[in-house]
Amino acid sequence: MSDPVFIAPKGGLTLGSVAEACGVPLPDGADPSQPVTGAAPLETAGPSELAYMDNARYGDALATTRALACLVSPRFAPRVPAGTIALVTRDPYRAYAGLLARLYEEAMRPGSLFAAAGVSPGAHVHPQARLEDGVRIDPGAVVGPGAEIGAGTVLGPNAVIGPNVRIGRDCSIGAGTTLTHALVGNRVIVHPGARIGQDGFGFAMGAGGHIKVPQVGRVIIQDDVEIGANTTIDRGASRDTVVGEGTKIDNLVQIAHNVVIGRHCVIVSGVGISGSTTLEDYVVLGGQVGVVGHLRIGMGSQIAGSSNVNRDVPPGSRWGGTPAKPVRTWFREMTTLARLAERSGKDEAEG
């Protein structure tokens, strides 16, 4: 039995069309009509495939690659072997990503299990819901009353869209997701199992018991956002939870009520953001970062993985540690502690 190919490369691409798409000039003597059948790592790329290289650690792999062509920075271009065409660009990885998007269009967003547009048997769409042309709804999906779904959007199996939810055009809503109390922009990707719009965790604490605070806000997800599998985004308590345009959120992230995330932020898996915190544009949170509530993380700041942020972060900062602080301070503290521990160990041995 042969191994299945889950995502096949698009046919009809040539070296010339690929170079043009990547904005890279072909070197003299290269044949632009040569077919390109795929992309692969340096070690496994064959004579009709492309690879990329932008890290000195892979110098040996570059020297022995059999790839038809390799996207490289000017620094590594002289090391491309004679049998491989050097496609020189300042940002090989970004160019490679653009190439992959052309070769593997199916991998760019989750698709329908059923190729035809329309409502599949076994799906349940309320008569008061409104679907634009070209919407695809897989079996088991539920669309509530008053919901509106834009053209080209796909709902995976068992996805649940609550009453009055708005979903824009060309979105992909993965299998088993729930979307309630939410307004979703265009070209948004939500991976399987995500939960968006459920109650925020709000209680008035007291000795006589904890009184639930009604959560009456919404979730606003702007255009071109991607949300990973099993991520949870709570709706606002009295104002909206917002995820800004172009932000990318990994799997297993928790975003609490009233959080506002700016444009083009990157949030890696395992992050927890407590209520009413604001991330300005282009913030990056590494894996397993914890952010306490009611803070502001300034534009362009980067927080190292496994850090705990318990105070405001100025714009353009690089912080890490628990509690988080500027990375230079954090590194100095870690170095000092290591030296103290080493010295203490020597003293004990001598004693």
UniProtKB/Swiss-Prot annotation:
The active site is at 257 (proton acceptor). It is an enzyme of class 2 (transferase). It catalyses: a UDP-3-O-[(3R)-3-hydroxyacyl]-alpha-D-glucosamine + a (3R)-hydroxyacyl-[ACP] = a UDP-2-N,3-O-bis[(3R)-3-hydroxyacyl]-alpha-D-glucosamine + holo-[ACP] + H(+). GO terms for molecular function: N-acyltransferase activity. GO terms for cellular component: membrane. GO terms for biological process: lipid A biosynthetic process. Pathway: Bacterial outer membrane biogenesis; LPS lipid A biosynthesis. Keywords: Acyltransferase, Lipid A biosynthesis, Lipid biosynthesis, Lipid metabolism, Repeat, Transferase. Pfam families: Hexapep, LpxD. The keyword Calcium does not apply. CDD domains: LbH_LpxD (cd03352). InterPro entries: Hexapep, Hexapep_transf_CS, LpxD, Trimer_LpxA-like_sf, UDP_GlcNAc_AcTrfase_non-rep. Coiled coil: none annotated. Catalyzes the N-acylation of UDP-3-O-acylglucosamine using 3-hydroxyacyl-ACP as the acyl donor. Is involved in the biosynthesis of lipid A, a phosphorylated glycolipid that anchors the lipopolysaccharide to the outer membrane of the cell. Belongs to the transferase hexapeptide repeat family. LpxD subfamily. This is UDP-3-O-acylglucosamine N-acyltransferase.
